[in-house]
Design a protein with these regions (language model features):
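N-terminal hydrophobic/helix-forming segments and targeting peptides
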Residues: 1-456
Length: 456
């Protein structure tokens, strides 16, 4: 089903399945606006399907369902296959971090009767898109006594929202002469928290009132910002988009749409696979996949090591064989073709909404710099599988040559000598506070990922 519009094949029964699946996805997306929430919600979904931590198993056998969590920001789950791990795994890997605005460690200040939060944006954003929209605050505050306070402000209907102001058009003559990259600077992305002074305070009374509210509601003080991790994200739930309800608008489709569909493909398995099936959800992709929770961390290989150790006698050669024989889909989104900005695409090699799961044989920029370039033999295997399963799919590049580019986690796992190719959902308005995906593509990704887990 190559380059066909998926909507055309759905009968009424299948259309209901498409819409129902997307309702569950919308719930996950709305509830998973940070990496920590994405992981905790993944754990809930997995446990509801019978997955358990490794400690719950004395010795794993085919069909067992096991999961790992790393530092509350990575999630890995496995369905043990009938073949030994050294024969390789079938892995779906996505990232659960999204572009956002982070709160600095010493952030709270008052200026001219406004209480403001100083911030530092995370990932590649068009900064001007983040002003004058309702924003929410999510994260954790870790106190010296070891307690951890969960913060969520802005999505409960009874909550206030916060935001970042912009200059009125009437006084914007100088601002309008700036380039889009400079019209809002990084240091301008400070969040307004309040304007009401605390009675009896003479200095920084508005800031004092905000601190009073935080103390009463969350029991933390200004000094606790030093050990806090607070993220500013768009407020509000994901929504149906378009009069025909054919699309989903929401924050964080990149890459939680692939994270959710990959997760569901594994946890919904109701049979013992030939090869162990795996879903791995990683952090820090938007800033280079670095650190203990990024794809470059050793944690993923460590989990395979733990499985080998549980099921047999561990050795380095067993781990290397398992990795080398593994086949993986780097489940990441692709740039959707937008007719309003058609000039950035090669139309023959673009990702179209509604045409199904999108493969990127290679990513990178300019002369394929930083690319993972998948083996054509591997792509041929996948083509044959998806055609036999009736899954709609397409291939694309990330725009015209020299127009720009981007990368994924694919090359990192490719460095382990796995077979890896990027496969995900086409997204409009990528990295904006509101991104758009087709419900058909979400469903076809789920079906494609399920089929991949059976690849011989």
């Amino acid at each position: 089903m190559y380059r066909k519009n998926a909507w055309e094949k759905y009968d009424e029964e299948t259309l209901e399945l498409v819409m129902s699946f997307n309702e569950s996805y919308k719930q996950y997306l709305s509830a998973s606006k940070t990496e920590r929430l994405a992981v905790s919600n993944a754990v809930k979904l997995a446990e509801a399907k019978g997955f358990k931590p490794l400690e719950a198993y004395e010795k794993l056998v085919p069909g067992d369902k096991v999961y790992f969590v790393n530092k509350k920001k990575n999630f890995v789950c496995y369905v043990i296959g009938s073949e030994p791990l050294e024969a390789g795994l079938r892995v779906l890997g996505a990232h659960i971090d999204s572009p956002r605005i982070d709160v600095k460690q010493d952030p709270l200040y008052e200026r001219d009767n406004f209480a403001l939060l100083d911030t530092h944006y995370y990932g590649g954003i068009k900064k001007y898109q983040w002003v004058t929209i309702p924003l929410a605050i999510y994260g954790v505050v870790c106190k010296k006594d070891g307690s951890v306070i969960d913060v969520a402000i802005g999505d409960d209907p009874t909550d206030p929202v916060v935001g970042i102001s912009d200059l009125l058009i009437h006084l914007s003559a100088d601002q309008m002469q700036k380039s889009a990259a400079k019209v809002i600077e990084g240091e301008d992305l400070d969040v307004t928290l309040g304007s009401m002074p605390l009675k009896g305070e003479e200095k920084n009374a508005v800031k004092a009132n905000v601190l009073r509210i935080l103390k009463e509601k969350y029991d933390f003080e200004e000094a606790d910002f030093v050990s806090a991790e607070l993220e500013i994200v768009p407020a509000g739930p994901s929504r149906d988009y378009g009069l025909d309800r054919s699309m989903v608008a929401g924050y964080g489709h990149d890459d939680r749409v692939c994270a959710y569909t990959s997760l569901r493909a594994v946890i919904d398995m109701d049979f013992v696979p030939t090869y162990t099936a795996c879903c791995v959800l990683v952090d820090k992709e938007e800033v280079g996949s670095i650190g203990a929770t990024g794809a470059q961390s050793k944690f993923f290989a460590d989990t395979i090591m733990y499985l080998i150790d549980n099921m047999s006698t561990y050795s380095e050669i067993k781990l290397r064989k398992a990795l080398t024989n593994t086949k993986m889909l780097s489940s990441d989104v692709s740039a959707g073709y937008d007719p309003l900005f058609a000039y950035v695409n090669d139309s023959k090699n673009a990702a179209y909404l509604g045409h199904g799961l999108c493969f990127n044989k290679y990513t990178g920029s300019r002369g394929k710099s930083g690319a993972n370039d998948a083996m054509p033999e591997y792509m041929a295997e996948i083509r044959n599988l998806l055609d036999s399963c009736g899954v709609n799919y397409q291939t694309a590049e990330l725009g015209k040559v020299d127009q720009g580019g981007g990368g994924t986690i694919a090359y990192i796992l490719g460095n382990e000598n796995m077979y890896v190719i990027d496969a995900g959902v086409a997204v409009l308005c990528m990295h904006a506070p509101m991104e758009i995906v087709s419900k058909a593509d979400v469903y076809e990704a789920y079906q494609g990922y399920k089929a991949f887990l059976t690849l011989e």
